[in-house]
């Protein structure tokens, strides 16, 4: 099993690489790429950790050497949010970065499972899909926007609010990966009930949690460590699915034939071909149905931005 991390010298990339080095199955290969010259050194640093995961780092303009033979590619390259910026402010820089990297993925490892972390995810996933279509290698079952950070934040905040064991909290988060497009389905959480006020405040907190971190870091960065953990969880689920493990389900932003939008975050069953099955997200409350319907114009606009960028 070979996993490539593109953007491996950044805050998310280094956290993700550390977690993968310690958690990938024995015998795996971990390939780190970043434009920054420090990247081979990050790999050397991680190589001293005593796990049976081989690691190699690559720097420079061309990620191709890092991508050869990759089964899973996780892309965190790009600029991070600063105070006062929203995820769409990142579009101007990150759109081009994702396009260029996906062109190399399409040419080098077209059947790899690709997880996009680079924001704005609502748009960068659409860019990746269009680039792959142009290259004639698009498989909607192999492209994912990683929204797991919204899921782990939901799990954490629910457990804190209700005094639950966080390991027991399961919650689907649907829609997209920014602002109002993030919709945690709190009505489905087992073992917890919420007042209308709690639903409103918790939903808003989950939607704005990224900004909470950006402001707390006071110009020193965005959510890198929690995002690294979220990306590792999702990446390991992709690996487990590829290895044939049963019942691996994660929420992800995918081209899943949703009635709501071309790309939509929802639960998916993972397997040897990436998405084995897009799962229904179940019954929702009136609050959730209204929030879902009201986000769709925003989400569709984000998607169109990505499609138009490539065309």
From Swiss-Prot:
MF annotations from Gene Ontology: L-malate dehydrogenase (NAD+) activity
EC class (word): oxidoreductase
Top-level taxon in the UniProt lineage: Bacteria
GO terms (BP aspect): malate metabolic process; tricarboxylic acid cycle
InterPro entries per UniProt: L-lactate/malate_DH, Lactate/malate_DH_C, Lactate/malate_DH_N, Lactate_DH/Glyco_Ohase_4_C, Malate_DH_AS, Malate_DH_type1, Malate_DH_type1_bac, NAD(P)-bd_dom_sf
Family statement: Belongs to the LDH/MDH superfamily. MDH type 1 family.
Assembly description: Homodimer.
The protein, known as: Malate dehydrogenase
Chain's gene name: mdh
């Amino acid at each position: 099993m070979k996993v490539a991390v593109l953007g491996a010298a950044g805050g998310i990339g280094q956290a993700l690489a550390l977690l993968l080095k310690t958690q990938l199955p024995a015998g795996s290969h971990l390939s780190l790429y970043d434009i920054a010259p420090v990247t081979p050194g990050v790999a050397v640093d991680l190589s001293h950790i005593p796990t049976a995961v081989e690691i190699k780092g690559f720097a420079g303009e061309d990620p191709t050497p890092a991508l050869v033979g990759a089964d899973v590619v996780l892309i965190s390259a790009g600029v991070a949010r600063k105070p006062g910026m929203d995820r769409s402010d990142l579009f101007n820089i990150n759109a081009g970065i994702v396009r260029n990297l996906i062109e190399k993925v399409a040419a080098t490892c077209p059947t790899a499972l690709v997880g996009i972390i680079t924001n704005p995810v609502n748009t960068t996933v659409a860019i990746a899909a269009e680039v792959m279509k142009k290259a004639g290698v698009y498989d909607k079952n192999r492209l994912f926007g990683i929204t797991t950070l919204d899921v782990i934040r939901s799990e954490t905040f629910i457990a804190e609010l209700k005094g639950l064991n966080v390991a027991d909290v399961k919650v689907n988060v649907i829609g997209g990966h920014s602002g109002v497009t993030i919709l945690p389905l709190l009505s489905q959480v087992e073992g917890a009930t919420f007042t209308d006020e709690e639903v409103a405040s918790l939903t808003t907190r989950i939607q704005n949690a990224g900004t909470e971190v950006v402001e707390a870091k006071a110009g020193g960065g965005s959510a890198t460590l929690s995002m690294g953990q979220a990306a590792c969880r999702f990446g390991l689920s992709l690996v487990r699915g590829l290895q044939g493990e049963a019942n691996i389900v994660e929420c992800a932003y995918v081209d899943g034939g949703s009635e709501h939008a071309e790309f939509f975050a929802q639960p998916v069953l993972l397997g040897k071909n990436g998405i084995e099955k897009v799962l229904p997200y179940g019954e929702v409350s009136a609050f959730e149905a209204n929030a879902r319907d009201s986000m769709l114009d925003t989400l569709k606009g984000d998607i169109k931005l990505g499609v138009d960028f490539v065309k």
